């Protein structure tokens, strides 16, 4: 994969997987993964990137998904993919987990690993990204006997101690 941005601004890179049947799972899974590529100027990070009607859930950032520091609230919006007007998905579970390249020797309880919220009637949800690193914010919805999962990645910077 190669991408050369034609101009400054923000670009949403989207990857859509085919349906995959995972061992031990009752339904096949279709993944949509999104990340905002920032190129020198804040322009377009909040633009909706509708991936496909084949997906049953979309996540869009309501908080700029870069320039974040630990402890910030991160707002997202869950909706059903559609051209034109959006259809908010109320009550969808939104999970946030920090990526660890090397898992810790002892895992803390799941409730300390995965932050969980539900979307409001308008489809909005808030999670707190507590530590530096890459965070995956994910919504899952079942439709037509397929688990549809959309993950929006956001990077949390180390807080500067310089004054």
Question: Positions of the model-derived regions?
Answer:
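Short aromatic-acidic-glycine turn motif
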Residues: 97-108
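Short, acidic Ser/Thr/Gly-rich low-complexity loop/linker segments typical of extracellular
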Residues: 107-122
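Short, aromatic- and glycine-rich surface loops/edge beta-strands on solvent-exposed regions
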Residues: 7-21, 134-142
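Beta-strand-rich domain onsets/edges
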Residues: 26-91, 98, 145-162
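Short strand-edge motifs at loop-to-beta-strand transitions and within beta-strands
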Residues: 1, 125-127
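Copper-binding active sites and cupredoxin-like electron-transfer domains
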Residues: 89-92, 119-121, 134-137
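Residue-level recognition of well-ordered beta-strand positions that form the cores
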Residues: 16, 77-79, 95, 140
